[in-house]
């Protein structure tokens, strides 16, 4: 049973909700995270939704976008609410995105040239618009909905991300690189990876010791044998991506454990925007408020406040104020100020929770109108966020730790 703690207490291997799971220093535990490739049907929908968002922001930085995508065999459906001055060729944006992913022939289960693109897009509700942003100064723009958002950071990797999810993403990135370069001529766009690491619990910190299990499942042509596929993936992906120091004789590797994976993408499973929220964030570490990111402009705090919370958490860790950090913020629709801000340090900080909160309040303004300015969220940057995780990657403003004003 979870043991209740305050935000500053130690003894928690994960502490997803501020609770701890009663673990002694020196104990070891296993933790697993997964990632999905660009051609996974849900991730394909995320990319399309964010491509639509970017297309609007390129012409209208103040566009209000909430675009969901559904994918099934031979069909893409866009649905949602968009209020924008932009003139967007939805057919073109969708087809170019699908082509980039790699679905360019019906033999792969989907073809950007022949798929049917359906639209069910309305204007944003005038009631929401009136209560959130109409006739308001930028700094007074309200949250587009109620909700809770979390940001997490850990010092176990240079990226301040959990090693499990970092490695899972890197496996998928390597697969896509080899597919696009034709080294894996037989590979198709759909793939999934999963990494289990053994951790040592040390005074609230989670210290990765070794990789326990690796799972890779990837869509492939019928012209390659499973034996050859497994050998190729082992030699050119697993052994290249996973640092040798984490691999030992007991590490388990499963490559296409189900066998054949010729039928993939939307032909194998229906896809939907926002169904890979753990892949998009921390791989199960920290916590998640439930709101998805893709297809949403900055007024949707599901996205912007989650980015800001990550910025806060990473800044605290990079400043040496704690080794692990979880930040929660909450909002009410139409109100600019967050309702609550909470920080958990898992017992890894020399500061009290009150001191950490004071540092956050002194250094960060978490109103949506300030977040958009500080993180430059009106730019068309979102399609790149929609694969391999929104956090822990260079080139995004929320990954640049802020120098903090701290009273010693």
Swiss-Prot record:
ATP binds at residues 40, 190-192, 258-261, 269, 275-276, 292, 296, 300. GO terms for molecular function: ATP binding; metal ion binding; methionine adenosyltransferase activity. One of its GO terms (biological process) is determination of adult lifespan. GO terms for cellular component: cytosol. It is an enzyme of class 2 (transferase). Pfam families: S-AdoMet_synt_C, S-AdoMet_synt_M, S-AdoMet_synt_N. Mg(2+) binds at residue 34. Transmembrane segments: none annotated. The keyword Nucleotide-binding applies. Keywords: ATP-binding, Magnesium, Metal-binding, Nucleotide-binding, One-carbon metabolism, Potassium, Transferase. InterPro entries: ADOMET_SYNTHASE_CS, S-AdoMet_synt_C, S-AdoMet_synt_central, S-AdoMet_synt_N, S-AdoMet_synthetase, S-AdoMet_synthetase_sfam. Catalyzes the formation of S-adenosylmethionine from methionine and ATP. The reaction comprises two steps that are both catalyzed by the same enzyme: formation of S-adenosylmethionine (AdoMet) and triphosphate, and subsequent hydrolysis of the triphosphate. NCBIfam families: metK. This is S-adenosylmethionine synthase. It comes from Drosophila melanogaster. The gene is Sams.
């Amino acid at each position: 049973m979870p043991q209740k703690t305050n935000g500053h207490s130690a003894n928690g291997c994960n502490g997803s909700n501020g609770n701890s799971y009663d673990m002694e220093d020196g104990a070891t535990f296993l933790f697993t995270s997964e990632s999905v490739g660009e051609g996974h049907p849900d991730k394909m929908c995320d990319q399309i939704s964010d491509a639509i968002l970017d297309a609007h922001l390129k012409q209208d930085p103040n566009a209000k976008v909430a675009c969901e995508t559904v994918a099934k065999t031979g069909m893409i459906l866009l649905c949602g609410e968009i209020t924008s001055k932009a003139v967007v060729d939805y057919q073109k944006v969708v087809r170019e995105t699908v082509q980039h992913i790699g679905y360019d022939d019906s033999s792969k289960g989907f073809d950007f040239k022949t798929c049917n693109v359906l639209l069910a897009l309305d204007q944003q509700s005038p009631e929401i618009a009136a209560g959130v942003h109409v006739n308001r100064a930028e700094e007074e723009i309200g949250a587009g909905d109620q909700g809770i958002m979390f940001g997490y950071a850990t010092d176990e990797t240079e990226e301040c991300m959990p090693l499990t999810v970092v490695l899972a993403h890197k496996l998928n990135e390597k697969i896509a690189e080899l597919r696009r370069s034709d080294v894996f001529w037989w590979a198709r766009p759909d793939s999934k990876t999963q990494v289990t690491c053994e951790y040592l619990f040390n005074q609230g910190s989670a210290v990765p010791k070794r990789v326990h299990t690796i799972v890779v499942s990837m869509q492939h042509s019928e012209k390659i044998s499973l034996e050859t596929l497994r050998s190729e993936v082992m030699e050119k992906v697993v052994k290249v991506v996973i640092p040798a120091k984490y691999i030992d004789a007991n590490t388990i590797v499963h490559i296409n454990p189900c066998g054949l994976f010729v039928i993939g993408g939307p032909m194998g499973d229906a896809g939907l925007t926002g169904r890979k929220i753990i892949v998009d964030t921390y791989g199960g570490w920290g916590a998640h408020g439930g709101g998805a990111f893709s297809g949403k402009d900055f007024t949707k705090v599901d996205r912007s406040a989650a980015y800001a919370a990550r910025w806060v958490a990473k800044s605290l860790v990079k400043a040496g104020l704690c080794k692990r950090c979880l930040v929660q913020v909450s909002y009410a629709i139409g109100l600019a100020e967050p309702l609550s801000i909470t920080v958990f340090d898992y017992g890894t900080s020399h500061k009290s929770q009150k001191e950490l909160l004071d540092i956050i309040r002194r250094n960060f303004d978490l109103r949506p109108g300030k977040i958009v300015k500080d993180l430059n969220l009106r730019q068309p940057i979102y399609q790149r966020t929609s694969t391999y995780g929104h956090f822990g990657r260079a080139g995004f403003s929320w990954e640049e730790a802020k120098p903090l004003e701290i009273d010693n």
